[in-house]
């Protein structure tokens, strides 16, 4: 199979939405019958984002095969059907780590290791391997043109485009076209300079996507075309919209996909965006709304919970209700009390790490249990629910997780010392292991107990969900907690680890050790989130 490459770069400022723009174009091309994949190349020196602060970087998206990746890969999976893997995201840190390891082994036969050709060659190799087997590979370069860290990646894609030829490679550049209210006009100069910088390193954009808070007039598009040497029809206006799922239709309306297929000489049918039209219809025509409180540690940056946010929206689409998310810092629950949780239709406690705010999450789980408020716990959200139940129902005073209190008399949650990875191989860990890359990661098989709410929600006794955690339920307490009324409704493939818990005497109280949000998409939703939102809406109406 001959793979074509679309390299996506950004200029002027960061956070313009390169990932969403690239994913939207990929969605249109997929709707034309093409097999599409996407890669994200991150210039930072971290080996992966696994140990980075969510406040700085946003969420860590976990792939089925256990890679800790950039949150843009979540956008990719939500827009196209292709599942991302370890091949779809790599960083400068990963490149340098691997190249230096090979140098230590003597694989370069004494050569002086340099950015060109050794680093750039490794980047090209990874791009080619990640794109193998697909008609189209969208390759997004993180950061902006002009960043020092991006230079090796930009040089690598310049070389790769030259090597494969113009009929197999093209460049899409995303820029900001600001509107100055004082002058009452759109300013194109930043875009002109951004393209000039890109051209100075040998990259000539074929498509220019112009981000603005409004549609860019034809006269301004013509001006941009003139000064950037990009065809006017390829100067695409991407205005602000109230839903990211409108972007595919916005790009298609301007013929962006047609530019691609003509350039690559592809004979493919027109894009069928019926599924996306259905998504937009449900989004625009809700029959009600619910307010869900998300009680977490990183609430100052919603992107820290990006996939959870989107999964709740998807569940709203499936139930034809608007989901309003109220972010609540778990420390505020500790300081101000559970009264701040009043008037919520449901409560969700997402994953997280560290002791700060954990008692607030435990209080939140108690409030939801005692007041019959629908509760969904994810990862740490399951652990705090279990700790709360152990303390206040099972009579295990001062029960806790050893992550937060190594001296607790009742360690109902403890460090996993061994587990099976996504390939069924045994993994080991102890207190001295590195933090990075040593968690239970990736998609794992889970057995649900027949007759439980979790089994009814999924409609199956076996499921696959993605994990990212070091701590698990202590099996020594399972019998005691079961006798107190806690239901262990899901277990790992070898039945050794608790995956799902629930409470019977409650309208809807389910918590899972896994991260179901990573499997939710706007077109398909996710059964756990759909049931959670449905229960919230039902109780609101009762």
Swiss-Prot record:
Q: Which residues bind ATP?
A: 15-20, 72, 239-241
**Cross-referenced InterPro entries:** Class_I_gatase-like (IPR029062), CTP_synthase (IPR004468), CTP_synthase_N (IPR017456), GATASE (IPR017926), GATase1_CTP_Synthase (IPR033828), P-loop_NTPase (IPR027417)
Give residue ranges for domain Glutamine amidotransferase type-1. Answer: 291-542
SUPFAM superfamilies xref list: Class I glutamine amidotransferase-like, P-loop containing nucleoside triphosphate hydrolases
Job description of the protein: Catalyzes the ATP-dependent amination of UTP to CTP with either L-glutamine or ammonia as the source of nitrogen. Regulates intracellular CTP levels through interactions with the four ribonucleotide triphosphates.
Q: What else is known?
A: CTPSs have evolved a hybrid strategy for distinguishing between UTP and CTP. The overlapping regions of the product feedback inhibitory and substrate sites recognize a common feature in both compounds, the triphosphate moiety. To differentiate isosteric substrate and product pyrimidine rings, an additional pocket far from the expected kinase/ligase catalytic site, specifically recognizes the cytosine and ribose portions of the product inhibitor.
What family classification does the UniProt entry report for this protein?
Belongs to the CTP synthase family.
What is this protein's record name? CTP synthase
| Species this protein is from | Colwellia psychrerythraea (strain 34H / ATCC BAA-681)
The encoding gene:
pyrG
